[in-house]
């Protein structure tokens, strides 16, 4: 088993904290604060419970509020990502999730931890215009007015543009409706959402440019909505685990490795 001396267990900001699960809640908070993983303000929020959602605030967030619903807040330990320690906050109601994550992170840590690449943050908004005439020509008209479309979309979210994000490109496709053969021109609005989840922002932009799309295509816009296929917003991470570190509970490292390979083979062959 690889040594843990590369990442001192008692070093500042180390996420490897032995026997953390045996501590009381107040001891856990104090230990994370001592290691610099919680700020003094974090500690105050946790101890005072000021972090919990107030019913009056909840009533302004959604409709027909009756109260708030609490769930446990815990942290997964042992995460080493790009040579930096992290504790991962988790709000879950099911036992073993936090322990399982922490255990997997410890195994990964022994081999050097996880490595992640910069995350692509493009979401796609779709604006569907039903048109008469040559759909390919209508598509070209949209492409010719790309800058006007992007300027209008970005005017709706200037703060996102100030953070380096916003709508930065369009793509245009045309299809025939299967039922009656009607021509559809579908514009994809590509939006860099930076650190925001961005769904509402993309929907707002699609709504905002719909009238302009109708004017350009001389068509009728129906759907104007965020795409559920997020193939431009992809997080990539990798980890290498020495076979010896997989050994345990009566299984050799080789047998665990081979079982993981078989499970992956099934996942590739069967989408269920």
Feature map (PLM): residue ranges:
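Acidic/polar, glycine-rich intrinsically disordered N-terminal extensions of enzymes
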Residues: 1-86, 90, 94, 114-122
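Generic detector of well-ordered alpha-helical segments enriched in charged/polar residues
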Residues: 18, 26-33, 44, 59, ...
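Structural signal for hydrophobic packing residues in well-ordered secondary-structure cores
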Residues: 36, 105-112, 146-160, 206-221, ...
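Anaerobic metallocofactor- and corrinoid-dependent redox/one-carbon enzyme cores
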Residues: 49-67, 72-76, 92, 98-99, ...
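Beta-strand elements of well-folded, non-transmembrane domains
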Residues: 191-195
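Glycine-rich anion/phosphate-binding loop at the beta-strand->alpha-helix junction
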Residues: 196-197, 202-272
């Amino acid at each position: 088993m690889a040594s843990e001396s590369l990442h001192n267990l008692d070093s500042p900001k180390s996420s490897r904290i032995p026997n953390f699960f045996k501590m009381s809640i107040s001891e856990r908070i104090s230990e994370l604060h001592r290691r610099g993983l919680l700020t003094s303000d974090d500690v105050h929020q946790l101890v005072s419970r000021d972090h919990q959602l107030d019913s009056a605030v909840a009533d302004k967030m959604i409709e027909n509020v009756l109260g708030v619903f609490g769930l446990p807040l815990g942290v997964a330990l042992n995460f080493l990502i790009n040579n930096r320690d992290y504790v991962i906050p988790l709000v879950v109601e099911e036992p073993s999730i936090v322990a399982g994550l922490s255990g997997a992170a410890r195994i990964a840590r022994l081999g050097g931890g996880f490595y992640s690449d910069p995350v692509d943050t493009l979401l796609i908004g779709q604006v569907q215009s039903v048109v008469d005439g040559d759909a390919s020509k209508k598509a070209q008209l949209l492409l010719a007015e790309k800058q006007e479309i992007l300027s209008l979309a970005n005017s709706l979210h200037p703060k996102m543009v100030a953070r380096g994000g916003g709508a930065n490109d369009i793509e245009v496709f045309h299809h025939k409706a299967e039922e009656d053969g009607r021509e559809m021109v579908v514009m994809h609005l590509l939006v860099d959402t930076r650190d925001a989840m961005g769904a509402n922002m993309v929907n707002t932009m699609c709504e905002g440019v719909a009238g302009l799309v109708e004017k350009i295509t001389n068509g009728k816009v129906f759907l104007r909505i965020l795409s559920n296929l997020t193939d431009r917003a992809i997080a990539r991470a990798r980890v290498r685990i020495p076979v010896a570190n997989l050994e345990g509970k009566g299984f050799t490292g080789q047998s665990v490795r081979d079982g993981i390979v078989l499970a992956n083979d099934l996942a590739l062959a069967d989408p269920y």
